[in-house]
């Protein structure tokens, strides 16, 4: 406020306030945006849902609103997102047609089975069984590291084992078993949630001579 600036949440809140209190403007925008499609609907919060209702119109029969999302991927609760808006959408638009897509074109069945074992523990699980035609014999390993640096060293160790070592020290110290392993560095990807989590990995890769 001191800088006379608005962030994203402010823009949504201002838009909601304006549309809720200016009927002629609301009517013009509803006429302009006759079809509304929302992706990643599981990330919607109260202000965003209110904005959708104002734009689409609260006449359920006249609204042309399509929402796409997965309630089992709702991870933004810390900023107000609520998977409960799937239920509210059904209540506010009872004539809406629900289409459930259960086939995954991204992941193998091994990955999907592991994910569903975790998600199924939630009392809010949607009970949608995802399946894939991608077969895989590779198992999912779970490693709980005591610190972020220990985690980075574990990642380095796994890569070294699968490429056959990155130095003579790797061989002499017994960190690798087979120096003739067929993997290359280009076969690996390390995924992390936040950019801040990359620093221990960068340092561990640099120490071990792993290009990235």
Regions found by a protein language model. Name each.
Residues 1-88, 100-107:
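Conserved helicase NTPase motor core
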Residues 55-59, 93, 205:
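Active-site catalytic pocket residues across diverse enzymes, especially alpha/beta-hydrolases
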Residues 94-97, 102-211:
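Helicase P-loop NTPase motor core
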